Amino acid sequence: MKKVMMICLFAVAAMTANAQKFALIDMEYVLKNVPAYERANEQLNQVSKKWQAEVEALNTEAGTMYKNYQNEVVFLSEEQKKKKQEAIMQKEKEASDLKRKYFGPEGELFKKRTALLSPIQDEIYNAVKDISDQRGYSLVVDRSADAGIIYGSPIIEISNELLSKLGYQ
């Protein structure tokens, strides 16, 4: 009885192992060949530079205020010193708040990136899912990610097929 159970378990394990099919995609390659992704990244870079310039302008203004304060400190009364220090701290806080608003974890750049890239990512995901369903893949791995893939056979590489399905080849 034990032998029969062991043989059955071994047979089931062997069938399960044979039933799994894998595929590889190179997302870096795919995204480089999707013009909408390149345009979205260019838009994000432009808006990021604009917002960074705004933050830097406030930081520069705060720095200038501090230098002026340093030059005038000997001539100021305690009340004037306190007023100038508060103005400098307010300007630094304003710069910090603006930086957080634009570049923070839930900032404008994050929202804009999500709005621009989510439709592209969804389209790619749906195409990968369609290919996987058609070919019976259990798992699709991104070879460009740090997944520790040392070798992947070109036979299971579907990046070009994915680009064709998306209409870019």
PLM feature spans:
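Short, exposed beta-strand-loop hairpins at the edges of beta-sheets
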Residues: 150-151
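Hydrophobic h-region of N-terminal signal peptides that target proteins for export
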Residues: 6, 10-18
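Amphipathic alpha-helical segments
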Residues: 20-135, 139-147, 169
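Positively charged n-region of N-terminal signal peptides that target proteins for export
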Residues: 1-4
